[in-house]
């Protein structure tokens, strides 16, 4: 299993199909909610993929479908 190289970088969401989002680097992610309300992504949203747990009201859990890793993503306003 190779280490994901996109940690700490800003990635634009280019496609969002329900809980599946595709980032501009081509990686596909499955979004699961950490809060009491659902987290939805739209094309054009920018996310930072992080291995930590940053404090942000729009934190969601995001799963890398290609590497079976559970990570934390912070939604950044474009």
Please annotate each region the language model reported.
Residues 23, 31, 48-49:
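A generic structural signal for residues embedded in beta-strands
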Residues 28-37:
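Short alpha-helix capping/helix-loop boundary micro-motifs
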Residues 22, 39-40:
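Residue-level "contact hotspot" at macromolecular interaction interfaces
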Residues 1-10, 14, 40-78:
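Short, flexible, surface-exposed loop segments at domain boundaries
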Residues 13-28:
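Short, basic/aromatic beta-hairpin or loop at an interaction surface
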């Amino acid at each position: 299993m190779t280490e994901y190289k996109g940690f700490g970088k800003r990635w634009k969401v280019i496609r969002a199909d329900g809980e599946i989002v595709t980032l501009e680097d081509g990686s596909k992610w499955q979004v699961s909610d950490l809060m009491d309300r659902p987290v939805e992504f739209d094309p054009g949203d920018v996310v930072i993929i992080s291995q930590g747990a940053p404090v942000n009201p729009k934190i969601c859990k995001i799963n890398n479908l290609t590497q079976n890793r559970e990570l934390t993503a912070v939604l950044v306003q474009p």
